[in-house]
């Protein structure tokens, strides 16, 4: 029996060695047929002696039964996200913040790595054996994907070597190389199956299969980049040395990892990786920069759910070339006419793009764009596609000039362009069906009147059937009328009537926001409501009085005066006043509130992770803050969440105090 055990152990050791050479180092020493022979030999021995099968045997990677659902996993150490920077100026600002917090002037050493475009996972090893794998989820709770991760041959089921901690949680990214992605999609096309839009989606979809046997067939791989939980052992106090320790244990680590001293070396690494990006064989969307010293990392700490000692330096949006087939003109809520290019579909940054905004007539003129042109399309911020250039030497002879309409394409009203403004607008107001629809959608939206169940499709039908012309008409609807709409039964109709009834009780700030006055967002509406307290006072205010309100300048003041002075709007507001009520806003006297926010003009920027933006606004306002939507010299405080952008940069330029979300939460707690 001892010889059988020895033979099995030798086969397992040999197979693990060759798996590591093939899947991690990409340097196989034996042909596939020999690997298959060794695997088959092990399978036969284990079949004869099932009592000798162990969880970490190479034979146990594939074949677990399908799951009904993934169980939830609580991360013992939260899986934090990273803040982003998008240009060198923003990176230098990050570098300065790190130096300032450490009170250091000398160049710091950073560990620079690739920012892989895959799925973040956590691998928990106990006494060297992989016992659990989980997705990031929301950072606190993820999904148990152990059975699927065990099928990824790049991930060792047992760590090799010495000094392995009793419990260690390795973190990294599961991704799909481009060659495997293309092969997977080619096979799907042949079989008429689902084609994935990009390797990231393919990796995520493969990893979250309830049947591990499907995951096993997908060409997934893995690179590790950090550690979470660590118990019963020690790791080096340098991030890059930790990565080298992982590598010694048999874990895959990217070769493109480099120590850089000072910002110049970091930027040089970023530029080189950006240049080499196309030849890597897998998708990345930037580089990750981390302070290498663990001692310094601990000094720097964390902001809400991101470390202060690291940032993701993202690449610019990817670009592709395609052709403009047509240009159409859309009408927005305020009558803005927006030209939209209809494109020959093209994949940009992993998404099929067939439309792109052209913004306005000035942009069309600047580009020199014609219908039929070959253009460069960029996904701005990897979200909104836009045309950024024309390939003039590919212009066809029959390319047509783009004529901006003189009349609204929806209602036929005149289009006007106010001097000094780039945007042309339909003058039809609520006579225009397009504006009517968008105005009504805004009126019932969540942060306005919040009419539950009143979706876009319902609004469109109400306008098309001429049941509703303005917001006041919504409150004249009956269940009988609503049941005449598509997919609207008696119960749904009655629920909508109840929701409309509930919406009659609101706040003055929500009401003002719901009216859709140009450039009056939530923050401005709240400031107007707090300052004037009722409609009568607001109607009586002139431009100078309005300009005394935080967040209200000359332009916004004119919009408010013009809106309230327009006869049609007056009639709609009078009709709404008969059915909608709100308590007069409580007058907050800053001097009487013991709060660091009292009397301060505060701007929120970036993504908040602990409170929602709405909750943060409400709590700040309750403590006497005036929440503004833009940064100016009048701003007292900026609260910066994750991925804070231009507002944060402007605040730093103006020398305005900036705090993070964690500090805001602390101050809110002290004030309550």
UniProtKB/Swiss-Prot annotation:
The active site is at 115 (n6-amp-lysine intermediate). Disulfide bonds: none annotated. SUPFAM superfamilies: BRCT domain, DNA ligase/mRNA capping enzyme, catalytic domain, Nucleic acid-binding proteins, RuvA domain 2-like. PANTHER family: CHROMOSOME TRANSMISSION FIDELITY FACTOR 18, DNA LIGASE. DNA ligase that catalyzes the formation of phosphodiester linkages between 5'-phosphoryl and 3'-hydroxyl groups in double-stranded DNA using NAD as a coenzyme and as the energy source for the reaction. It is essential for DNA replication and repair of damaged DNA. This is DNA ligase. PROSITE patterns: BRCT, DNA_LIGASE_N1, DNA_LIGASE_N2. Belongs to the NAD-dependent DNA ligase family. LigA subfamily. It catalyses: NAD(+) + (deoxyribonucleotide)n-3'-hydroxyl + 5'-phospho-(deoxyribonucleotide)m = (deoxyribonucleotide)n+m + AMP + beta-nicotinamide D-nucleotide. Zn(2+) binds at residues 408, 411, 426, 432. Residues 592-672 form the BRCT domain. InterPro entries: BRCT_dom (IPR001357), BRCT_dom_sf (IPR036420), DisA/LigA_HHH (IPR041663), DNA_ligase (IPR001679), DNA_ligase_AS (IPR018239), DNA_ligase_CS (IPR033136), DNAligase_adenylation (IPR013839), DNAligase_N (IPR013840). Keywords: DNA damage, DNA repair, DNA replication, Ligase, Magnesium, Manganese, Metal-binding, NAD, Zinc. GO terms for molecular function: DNA binding; DNA ligase (NAD+) activity; metal ion binding. GO terms for cellular component: cytosol. Transmembrane segments: none annotated. Its EC number is 6.5.1.2. Pfam families: BRCT, DNA_ligase_aden, DNA_ligase_OB, DNA_ligase_ZBD, HHH_2, HHH_5, Nlig-Ia. GO terms for biological process: DNA repair; DNA replication. NAD(+) binds at residues 32-36, 81-82, 113, 136, 173, 290, 314. Its cofactor is Mg(2+); Mn(2+).
């Amino acid at each position: 029996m001892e010889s059988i055990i020895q033979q099995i152990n030798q086969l397992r050791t040999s197979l693990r060695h060759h798996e590591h050479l093939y899947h991690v180092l990409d340097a196989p020493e034996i042909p596939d047929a020999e690997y298959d022979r060794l695997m088959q030999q092990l399978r036969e021995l284990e079949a004869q002696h099932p009592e000798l099968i162990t969880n970490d045997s190479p034979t146990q990677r594939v074949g677990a039964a399908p799951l009904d659902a993934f169980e939830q996993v609580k991360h013992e150490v939260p899986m934090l996200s990273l803040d982003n920077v998008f240009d060198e100026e923003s990176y230098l600002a990050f570098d300065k913040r790190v130096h300032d917090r450490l009170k250091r002037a000398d160049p710091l050493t950073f560990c620079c790595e690739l920012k892989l475009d895959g799925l973040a996972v956590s691998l928990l090893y106990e006494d060297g054996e992989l016992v659990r794998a989980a997705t990031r989820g929301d950072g606190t709770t993820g999904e148990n994907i152990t059975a699927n991760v065990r099928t990824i041959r790049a991930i060792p089921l047992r760590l090799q070597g010495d000094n392995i901690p009793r419990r260690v949680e390795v973190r990294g990214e599961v991704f799909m190389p481009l060659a495997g992605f293309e092969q997977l999609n080619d096979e799907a096309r042949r079989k008429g199956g689902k084609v994935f839009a990009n390797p990231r989606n393919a990796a995520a979809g493969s990893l979250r299969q309830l049947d591990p046997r499907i995951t096993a067939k997908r060409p997934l791989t893995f690179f590790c980049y950090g550690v979470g939980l660590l118990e019963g052992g020690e790791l080096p106090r340098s991030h890059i040395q930790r990565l080298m320790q992982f590598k010694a244990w048999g874990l895959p680590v990217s070769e493109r990892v480099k120590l850089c001293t000072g910002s110049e070396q970091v930027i040089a690494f970023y530029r080189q990786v950006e240049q080499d990006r196309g030849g890597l064989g897998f998708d990345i969307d930037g580089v990750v920069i981390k302070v290498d010293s663990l001692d310094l990392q601990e000094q720097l700490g964390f902001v809400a759910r991101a470390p202060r000692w690291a940032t993701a330096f993202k690449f610019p949006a990817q670009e592709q070339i395609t052709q403009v087939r047509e240009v159409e003109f859309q009408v927005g809520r305020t009558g803005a006419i927006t030209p939209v290019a209809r494109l020959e579909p093209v994949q940009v940054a992993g998404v099929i793009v067939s439309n792109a905004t052209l913004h306005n007539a000035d942009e069309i003129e600047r580009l020199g764009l014609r219908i039929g042109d070959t253009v460069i399309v960029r996904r701005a911020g990897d979200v909104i596609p836009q045309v950024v250039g024309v390939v003039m030497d590919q212009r066809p002879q029959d390319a047509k000039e783009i004529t901006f309409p003189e009349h609204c394409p929806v209602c036929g009203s005149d289009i006007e362009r106010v001097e000094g403004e780039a945007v042309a607008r339909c003058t039809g107001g609520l006579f225009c069906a397009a504006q009517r629809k968008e105005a009504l959608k805004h009126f019932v939206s969540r942060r306005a009147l919040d009419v539950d169940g009143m979706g876009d499709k319902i609004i469109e039908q109400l306008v098309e059937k001429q049941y509703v012309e303005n917001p006041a008409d919504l409150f004249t609807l009956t269940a009988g009328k609503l049941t005449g709409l598509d997919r609207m039964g008696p119960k749904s109709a009655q629920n909508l009537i109840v929701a409309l009834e509930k919406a009659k009780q609101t706040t003055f700030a929500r009401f003002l926001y719901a009216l859709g006055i140009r450039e009056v967002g939530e923050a401005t509406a709240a400031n107007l409501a707090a300052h004037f307290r009722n409609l009568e006072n607001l109607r009586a205010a002139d431009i100078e009085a309005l300009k005394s309100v935080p967040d209200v300048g000359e332009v916004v003041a004119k919009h408010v005066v013009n809106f309230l002075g327009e006869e049609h709007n007056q009639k709609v507001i009078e009709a709404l006043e008969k059915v909608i009520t709100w308590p007069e806003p409580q007058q907050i006297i800053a001097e009487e509130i013991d709060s660091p926010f009292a009397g301060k003009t505060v701007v929120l920027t970036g993504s908040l992770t602990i409170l929602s933006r709405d909750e943060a606004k409400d709590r700040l306002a309750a403590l006497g803050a005036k929440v503004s939507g833009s940064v100016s010299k009048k701003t007292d405080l900026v609260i910066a969440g994750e991925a804070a952008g231009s507002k944060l940069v402007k605040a730093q330029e103006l020398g305005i105090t900036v705090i993070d979300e964690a500090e805001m939460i602390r101050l809110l707690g002290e004030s309550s």
